[in-house]
Regions:
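Conserved ABC ATPase signature
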Residues: 2-45, 58-65
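Generic recognition of flexible, low-complexity loop/linker segments
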Residues: 1-3, 92-93
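Catalytic Walker B motif of ABC-type/P-loop ATPase nucleotide-binding domains
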Residues: 53-57
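C-terminal lobe/lid and adjacent interdomain/linker elements of RecA-like ASCE P-loop ATPase modules
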Residues: 69-146
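Short strand-connecting beta-turns/loops that link adjacent beta-strands
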Residues: 8-9, 19-21, 49, 98-99, ...
Length: 146
């Protein structure tokens, strides 16, 4: 996987070059998930990242295999910067279940959101039988729609 840039009619274009094909694909022909993956890679793989990176549903539009790759980039970036990640994805939660310091669940209350923190110690007890993604989809961690 490689990329190329091209200037055409005064505009800079990004093109993706994927093995075994040597034909560059312009960004406008790439899927939304691929474009989002490339944007996340640019953010998370910075050699000198900002002190805080916030990601809102980084899994959107991605195949579960790509979500695992995003989770690896998030885990690696967390060694260099603080990250706040909001997700509704059981795949992302499961892929990150060993790489968080604090987990929060948000539930709807009558006058606003109710925030509940969960520690690694609490999670270790649950982890004996379930993945973090399973706990999320079961409603055990909150975040319920109703």
């Amino acid at each position: 996987l490689d990329y190329a840039t091209r200037i055409l009619f005064g505009h800079i274009g990004l093109e993706l070059v994927e093995a075994p094909f040597d034909l560059p694909l312009p960004a406008k022909r790439l899927s939304d998930g691929t474009l989002r993956f490339l944007a996340l890679a640019a953010i998370l793989l910075q050699p000198s990242p900002p002190p805080l990176i916030c990601l809102e549903e980084p899994e959107l539009g991605m195949h579960p295999d790509m979500i695992r790759m995003v989770a690896e980039m998030i885990a690696d970036a967390s060694a260099k910067t603080q990250l706040i990640v909001a997700t509704h994805s059981e795949h992302l939660l499961t892929a990150l279940q060993d790489d968080f310091d604090v987990l929060f669940a948000f539930d709807a209350g009558l006058t606003g959101s109710i925030v509940r923190p969960f520690s690694q110690e609490q999670f270790k007890k649950w982890r004996e039988e379930h993945t973090l993604g399973e706990l999320w989809t079961s409603g055990e961690l909150g975040g319920n729609r109703w």
